[in-house]
Amino acid sequence: MPTVPSIATPRFELVSMSLPFMEALARRDLGAAEHLIGAKVPTQMPDDLEHFLEYRILDLTVEPGWQPWLGRAIVLDDPRAGRRVIGSVGFHSPPDASGQVEIGYRIEPEFRRQGVATEVVRALFEWAWREHGITSFRASTSPDNVASQGVLAKFGFVQTGSQMDEYDGEELVFERKGWRPSS
């Protein structure tokens, strides 16, 4: 499996979550996961982690070349607590036939409302634009997730519909076409 370079932001390092890392998380082998990612991982795992890992492990097993597009751990280098994972961000897959990618992100509760999502989403959009010329983005969120909708609004996303997700239930669908850095 190729090594995928990290993406640096002013406050964080976005470290690609490799297949071995995700397999270690799925086994709840936190020691192995921490060794592989180079940071402490939360001991309290989100409720939807198993579902996320199931899909991403299958994706990377079948399509190893997808790794740069998929999940990245948001790593904070905290002078007091050391390097630790405080969330994740990534695309659901490489671009579709129209050149669009769908983004997803999750921030640990204690780090929400501090601009983390905005910073890491911007960094991932800039990477997709700089490395692959991507200017069309999609996102889906629960109707109740006002904070996530606020992040999307900052990037000029508009709601284009809704959908029923077999796992998450009703989701609002947002799109942003023609995105460029600083737009």
Locate predicted features.
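GNAT-family acyltransferases
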Residues: M1-E102, I107-E110, A123-W127, E131, ...
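Conserved beta-strand-loop-alpha-helix junction that forms the acyl-donor binding cleft
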Residues: A139-Q149, Y167
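Short Gly/Pro-enriched loop/turn and capping motifs at secondary-structure junctions
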Residues: E110-R112, N145
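Glycine-rich acyl-CoA binding loop
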Residues: G115-T118
